Amino acid sequence: MGIVKIKDKTFKTSIPEADILKKVQVVADRLNQDYADKTPVFLAVLNGSFIFAADLMRMITVPSEISFVKYASYEGTSSSGSMKTLMGLNQDLTGRHVVIVEDIVDSGFTMAHMIEDLKKKNPASIEVCSLLVKPGNLKVDLDINYAVMEIPNDFIVGYGLDYDQEGRNLRDIYTIVEE
């Protein structure tokens, strides 16, 4: 089991990259089946989902598009609950099937805000595809039909997720070690 130190925190390996990729493939297969007769628009939420989105999109075999949006609700190790749009979407989504690609759904505030913003663009449908979901920490009611993994309410880094902007490049997912 690997241990990494990022700034003032210590993390241990909790989900190896090989396990992540196997589970991403399962979700990609479902998306390929469900969108076989559609051309979905995948909206990757930056910065955290960039590695997940890249791996997922290489597994998607149906015609599709990808765009990027950026929201922020994290500072340090806890979700602030505050919301601001940093980089929006300029693409016309009218009548399109939208799949939001997110790294982690924690409190759900960011995702609920994004869904409300996207509904104003009149898409045919909106689905959520999240690498990780913390069901025990959800504060809002969300339908997450494409969850790769559910995890406990631990703080994690790696595979795109960060601690104060560091650790995104780690290939595995690491859980904080309580000191």
Listing of model-derived features with the role each one plays in the protein:
Residues 1-179:
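PRPP-associated nucleotide enzymes
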